[in-house]
């Protein structure tokens, strides 16, 4: 404007000034040729690099869109470019994608058994930025538990990770994810901030019982352990993972009570948890099928978790990422 108060930017895509990509008759950029070369280069990097960040770096160096030009290439281990591509593929069919999910709650019957009922007045938090909405959330199951020939859910098939809360007020969200170890897929999630912390503990306990799952959790906060202990349900919380002791990340002596369960999160452990998540996402889902090039990332159905992975930075609070870290550890 004439006052000079507004700012604007100009984006120059890598396809506009690429070496040897010009129309020889008029000297104009040959955009089609340039795009083909750029996309072929990306394909080579994506499927021939063991570094999940390599494709993100490649896109940032040779951007096709303004969003690619401002991608963060440092400070995160998550395959941001792959995640964004996946979310963009979901976008046009988002309603159909979400329609396969079960939204509801677990209720006790007269025999002390659970049954699932759908709810129409509660909604899961389906966006990473949920500060302006009701943050109570509700259970979202992507795949119902599978039973064996005896009608039982075998112990060990399902595992979980929990990022708990301790106080009834606060900004952090309670988050729990359940994974099917037979299929390597995330099958259930609850993320939210109910009125009372005990409400979140009860939701997680019912979910663990429903899947007969064992959970790793951040034991920095004591409330979850106390709640499970008071109900004689500590067998749904895993002992401190042996791998952390083997890697000298935790002390392995005189562990009892809350100290014997879960994981005491610190910078080193959290960093390793994020690395495990990134490695999971970048692993082919079906390595025995040469025609199936899908990654395990492409079988993740929780959109806000993926949004957290994109936004992750060392200064923020990313509850779903923390819960997933506990799961993979």
Regions found by a protein language model. Give the residues of each.
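RNase H-like, metal-dependent nuclease domains and their acidic two-metal-ion catalytic environment used
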Residues: 3-6, 12, 21-240, 282-329
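OB-fold/S1-family RNA-binding modules
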Residues: 16-18
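Short, solvent-exposed polar/charged micro-motifs at secondary-structure junctions
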Residues: 20-23, 247-249
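Short alpha-helix plus adjacent loop in nuclease-associated cores
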Residues: 236-287
